[in-house]
Structures are given as structure tokens and as C-alpha cells.
């Protein structure tokens, strides 16, 4: 039993790590005064909420790391959360970075790119966009109005004629000399103005060009400009102005209910709401700490940081947070909690969005709850399947064997918990042995970290089911985790032996001779089939990536003059094998320490591979 002794802990700023019985870090926090913060948890008159009491009962040790400043503590906390992935810290389910649009004005004919990382590289970034659907819709609008090039310059120039987008009027084909640099720059300026929210500038310019075209009787050009104007008007109509001249700001709203907090972020760019994102979080610790940690996690993922972040209240250390955000962005960022005026109304709007999102999530949760109850009933599970894990193995003739784990948390895909496993101990194509290794590694780690699934679904029949049962027996987990195998439907002859029919998906359970079927078309069957397909997709995708890397790597190493040291230098300079392959001859020649002749050989080798 852990006994808290305040005198043991420093009064300086720093980070604290709460550890469980096996030494596993389950919570990481920061504080301006470590002793004061920890005392607030353990004192008699401290926070008595059930979730706090629950958390503190699991503490067996607390480690502290002192820092010189609060900002250092903030940065260290972020680093440790990424390293340990503590169970009770905020987990943003969509742990991928958001999409942004990138345009490098230094290129001769710039193009728009979809990127997930915002770098301080001199390029212009627009976003973030919470969904790929939203950003692709924006791109389509831009290409319709301003037909910028769509493909990398090298691949464009290697074509014998312009691409299909040129034929349908959505690319100006600068790679084949179909537009002058001056006219192309006008398209770029228009696209940038539209993305920055300066539609009036674009409209005024197009109206002037249209009038000039009509005056010189260039009616086709005038009609094209008219269509561009109409497209802009339709786009602008769909965007709501919430603060004229308000610039770029992210607005955070918060809704509390029970032991949960719903946070909504409105992305406001040039006074218009361009997107929204919401997160449902467990309310373990105090609100200030929750909000501060959330902002660190959110903005620590290479997203576009705006001029201002508007909050419902200022958490402790908001000045440090603003300083950190400014450093990340390279420009000053304000963190504000407005008390009145338009900005206060924006925060209230974000709070209403958070509440609405919570209600919608609750309705979906109730529906998923019913589906999970049906799964538990039909598959004779001994516990409610809050967390379901499905495993799959992928290899080609025993090469690049990988395992995958897809996860459902309360019936919803938890993509942040998906895992790949490189098979270490199995030579050749032995799916059963590979599956044994993957399950053993996963469950041993689960025992150490006290994070076991409720239900394991195997992609396969009795053979795969026997493997998981063996692993559970060896780890004394039989009875603590439910298991089943899902076998794909079979093709069977009908009674006349002529036509073929497809049987239902079959579920195999331990200790049962016959399989169990779920009703065709039922939500329960759909949920489990989707999970099985996700595990398969995740394994195949990673397997293809490994094969592609290996192929590219072998091409690189076969080039005379490229050894292990040179290969590492190329990867460090360009960032990836794919980037080396896509590099132009000029970019290769510009790499420090790479002889011009070798740069030409590398470029020629990859060009030959493209055309072969």
C-alpha cells in the first residue's frame, strides 16, 4: 500500500509519473509546484471524486522529474506521454494528425499538396481539416475555379501528353507549356486568396478580367471567367461568417455530464468556420489539468496553429502554454478566455457544439450497446465485451511475416490502439506459430500493463481458436478472456448439385463441437465482420509497405557507389526511400557530400525502374 509523504517531494516545477504494482506508468502530469500538486490529491480535504479515488488506489509509486521552467515541464510531459502511452492520460482516439493543404510559392509552377505534418519550411499551409472528405471537397472547388497542376513535376514531364484533368478543364498543364508562368501565377494568387478567405479580392479580379475579355470579344474566355465567379459565389454561400476580420483562431467549447467531458474545437479561418472536431474524454482529474493536457496533445501533432486559441477558462500555466504554442508556430499565439463580446459568443457556440456532439454520441453509444449485448448473448460470452481485439497474420511465401491487431472499444473502432507485430521467432510460412508469437507478446504485455481485452476474435476456424486457447492456458488467463473464431463463408453445392450457394459466416467457440451463426444482415454480424476485415486490411497494408521498402532499398543498394553508409545518409537527408525515389536530379546533386556522378546514377536507376 502506497503512503504519501509530502516532504519527499520537491517544491520545484516538473513532471510526476504515477506507477502501478508492476512499475507500469499509468498517469503522467506536470505541476508548477510538485509537492503542492501531489498533496492536493492525497490530503483528507483534497479531491474526493470517485474517479480520483479510483486512480489513487492504484498508485504504488510516484516518480518526479524536476525541470528549470514550467515550459520545460510541459515539453517533458508531452515526451513522456508519447513514450509510455499511460492508460489514464487523455487518449485522442483519432491519434493521426489532421490534414492541411501545402503550397510552396518558391516553385516555378506551385501545386497544392495534402499533408499531415506542418513544417517550418517556408511553404504556406492552410487548415487544419478534420476529415479527408472536407479537405478533398475544398480541393475540388479550387481545381474547378483555378486549374493548378495536380501531379509532381517529374511525373508530369515524363508524360507524352497532358493528363486527363487537362482534358476536363481542371489542370492548366504547365508541364507541357499550355500556360505561361505569368498566367499560372495569377491562378496561384487566386487560389491562395480563396484559401485565405479573401473572396472579395478574387471576385473583383475575375470581374475585371471578364469585362476585359468581353470588350475584346474573347467570349469563350469571358464565359470561363463567368463560370469561375459562379463557383466562388456558391462556395462562399456555404460558409458562415462568425467574426468579420477575426483572423485565424481555434475555439474550444466544453460540456460536462456524469464522469465524461466532451470537447469541441471550431476551426475559424479569416472569420469563417471551416470545420469542427469533437472529443469525448473520461473526466479523471480536474478540469484545468484536463484542458491543458488536451491542448498539449492536440497541438503537439504538427497541426496548423492559429493566431489565437479561445478557451472557456484559462487553465493553470496558460502563459507557458501560449509561449510553447508560439515557439511551435514560429509566431506569437494568444491563449484567451474571453468574458464578453463576439469571442465570448464563439466560445458559447463551441460549447453548444460540444453538447450536441455529446447527445449524438450518446444515441450512437446506446445503439452500439444493444449490438454488443446481442454479441455477448449469441456467442455465450461470460462478460460484456467492452474491448474486442481481432488478430490476423499476413505473409507471402514466408517473407515479411506480420501480425495485426484491430480493436473495438465499446463497439467503436479504436484506431489509436491498432498494432503491428513483426514476427521474430518464426522462419518460413507458419501462420499458427506466427499467431502464437503475436498472441503471447500481446497478452504478456497486457498482464504487465493491466490492459487485457474482454473478448478476442480470431480470423479463422478451429485451428486458430486452439492456438489462442493454448496461450490463455499458459498465461493462466482461461476464463478471464472470452474467445471465438470467425471463419469465412463457404461455397456449397445445392441439393441438385448444380448451382452454388454461399453459407453463413461461422463462429467457433471453445468446448463446442458445432459452430454458431449470427443472423444474416444483423448489426452484430456486421460489427464483427467489419472488425475481422479491419484486422486483415491493417495486416495487408503494413505487409505491402514492408515489401515496397525492401524493393526500394535493394534498388538503392544495387547502385555502384551506394553502400550502407551512403544509403543511411540519403535516407537522413531526404527522410524516406520514397522521397529519394521521387527526388529530381537537381535535388540529388544539391545533397552535401554526394558526388555529381553518383547523383546521376541514382536518378537514372530510379527512372529506369519507373519505366520498366
Curated annotation (Swiss-Prot):
All residue ranges annotated as the GIY-YIG domain in the record:
11-90
One GO cellular component term noted in the UniProt record for this chain = excinuclease repair complex
Q: What is one process in the GO biological process aspect for this record?
A: SOS response
Superkingdom is Bacteria
Subcellular compartments: Cytoplasm
Q: Does this entry carry the keyword Cytoplasm?
A: yes
Where in this chain does the record put each UVR domain?
Answer: 200-235
GO molecular function, a single term = DNA binding
Q: Which UniProt keywords apply?
A: Cytoplasm, DNA damage, DNA excision, DNA repair, Excision nuclease, SOS response
Briefly, what is this protein's role?
A: The UvrABC repair system catalyzes the recognition and processing of DNA lesions. UvrC both incises the 5' and 3' sides of the lesion. The N-terminal half is responsible for the 3' incision and the C-terminal half is responsible for the 5' incision.
Q: What is the annotated quaternary arrangement, including any partners? A: Interacts with UvrB in an incision complex.
Report the NCBIfam families cross-referenced here.
PRK00558.1-5, uvrC
- Protein family per UniProt: Belongs to the UvrC family.
Q: What is this protein called in UniProt?
A: UvrABC system protein C
Naturally occurring in which organism (per UniProt)? Syntrophotalea carbinolica (strain DSM 2380 / NBRC 103641 / GraBd1) (Pelobacter carbinolicus)
Q: Gene name, please?
A: uvrC
Amino acid at each position: 500500500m502506497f503512503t504519501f509523504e509530502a516532504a519527499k517531494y520537491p517544491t520545484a516545477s516538473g513532471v510526476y509519473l504515477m506507477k502501478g504494482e508492476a512499475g507500469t506508468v499509468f498517469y503522467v502530469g506536470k505541476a508548477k509546484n510538485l509537492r503542492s500538486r501531489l498533496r492536493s490529491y492525497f490530503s483528507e480535504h483534497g479531491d474526493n471524486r470517485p474517479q480520483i479515488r479510483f486512480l489513487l488506489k492504484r498508485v504504488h509509486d510516484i516518480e518526479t522529474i524536476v525541470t528549470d521552467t514550467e515550459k520545460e515541464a510541459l515539453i517533458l510531459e508531452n515526451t513522456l506521454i508519447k513514450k509510455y502511452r499511460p492508460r489514464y492520460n487523455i487518449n485522442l482516439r483519432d491519434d493521426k494528425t489532421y490534414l492541411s493543404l501545402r503550397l510552396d510559392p518558391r516553385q516555378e509552377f506551385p501545386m497544392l499538396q495534402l499533408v499531415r505534418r506542418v513544417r517550418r519550411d517556408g511553404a504556406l499551409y492552410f487548415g487544419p481539416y478534420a476529415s479527408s472528405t472536407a479537405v478533398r471537397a475544398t480541393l475540388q472547388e479550387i481545381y474547378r475555379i483555378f486549374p493548378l497542376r495536380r501531379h509532381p513535376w517529374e511525373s508530369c514531364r515524363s508524360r507524352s501528353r497532358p493528363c486527363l484533368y487537362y482534358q476536363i478543364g481542371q489542370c492548366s498543364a504547365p508541364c507541357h507549356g499550355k500556360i505561361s508562368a505569368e498566367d499560372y501565377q495569377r491562378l496561384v494568387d487566386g487560389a491562395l486568396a480563396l484559401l485565405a478567405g479573401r473572396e472579395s479580392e478574387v471576385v473583383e479580379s475575375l470581374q475585371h478580367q471578364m469585362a476585359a475579355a468581353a470588350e475584346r470579344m474573347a467570349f469563350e474566355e469571358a464565359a470561363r471567367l463567368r463560370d469561375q465567379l459562379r463557383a466562388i459565389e456558391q462556395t462562399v454561400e456555404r460558409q458562415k461568417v462568425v467574426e468579420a476580420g477575426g483572423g485565424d483562431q481555434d475555439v474550444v467549447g466544453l460540456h460536462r455530464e456524469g464522469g465524461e467531458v466532451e470537447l469541441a474545437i471550431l476551426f475559424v479561418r479569416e472569420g469563417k468556420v471551416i470545420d469542427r472536431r469533437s472529443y469525448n474524454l473520461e473526466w479523471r482529474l480536474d478540469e484545468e489539468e484536463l484542458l491543458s493536457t488536451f491542448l498539449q496533445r492536440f497541438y503537439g501533432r504538427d497541426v496548423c496553429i492559429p493566431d489565437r486559441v479561445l478557451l472557456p477558462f484559462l487553465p493553470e500555466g496558460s502563459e507557458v502554454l501560449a509561449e510553447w504554442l508560439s515557439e511551435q508556430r514560429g509566431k506569437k499565439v494568444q491563449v484567451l478566455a474571453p468574458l464578453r463580446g463576439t469571442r465570448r459568443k464563439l466560445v458559447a457556440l463551441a460549447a453548444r457544439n460540444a453538447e450536441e456532439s455529446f447527445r449524438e454520441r450518446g444515441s450512437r453509444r446506446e445503439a452500439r450497446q444493444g449490438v454488443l449485448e446481442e454479441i455477448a448473448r449469441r456467442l455465450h460470452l461470460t462478460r460484456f465485451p467492452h474491448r474486442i481485439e481481432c488478430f490476423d497474420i499476413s505473409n507471402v511465401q514466408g517473407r515479411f511475416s506480420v501480425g495485426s491487431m484491430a480493436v473495438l472499444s465499446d463497439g467503436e473502432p479504436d484506431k489509436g490502439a491498432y498494432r503491428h507485430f513483426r514476427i521474430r521467432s518464426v522462419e518460413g510460412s507458419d501462420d499458427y506459430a506466427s499467431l502464437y508469437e503475436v498472441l503471447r507478446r500481446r497478452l504478456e504485455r497486457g498482464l504487465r500493463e493491466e490492459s487485457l481485452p474482454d473478448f478476442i476474435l480470431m480470423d479463422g476456424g478451429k485451428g486458430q481458436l486452439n492456438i489462442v486457447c493454448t496461450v490463455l492456458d499458459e498465461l493462466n488467463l482461461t476464463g478471464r478472456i472470452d474467445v471465438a473464431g470467425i471463419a469465412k463463408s463457404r461455397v456449397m453445392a445445392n441439393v441438385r448439385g448444380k448451382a452454388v450457394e454461399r453459407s453463413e459466416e461461422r463462429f467457433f467457440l471453445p468446448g463446442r463441437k458445432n459452430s454458431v451463426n449470427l443472423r444474416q444482415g444483423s448489426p452484430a454480424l456486421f460489427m464483427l465482420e467489419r472488425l475481422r476485415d479491419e484486422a486483415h486490411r491493417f495486416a495487408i497494408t503494413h505487409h505491402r509497405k514492408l515489401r515496397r521498402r525492401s524493393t526500394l532499398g535493394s534498388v538503392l543498394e544495387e547502385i555502384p557507389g551506394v553502400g550502407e553508409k551512403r544509403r543511411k545518409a540519403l535516407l537522413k537527408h531526404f527522410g524516406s526511400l520514397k522521397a529519394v525515389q521521387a527526388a529530381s536530379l537537381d535535388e540529388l546533386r544539391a545533397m552535401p557530400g554526394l558526388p555529381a556522378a553518383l547523383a546521376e546514377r541514382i536518378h537514372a536507376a530510379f527512372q529506369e525502374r519507373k519505366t520498366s
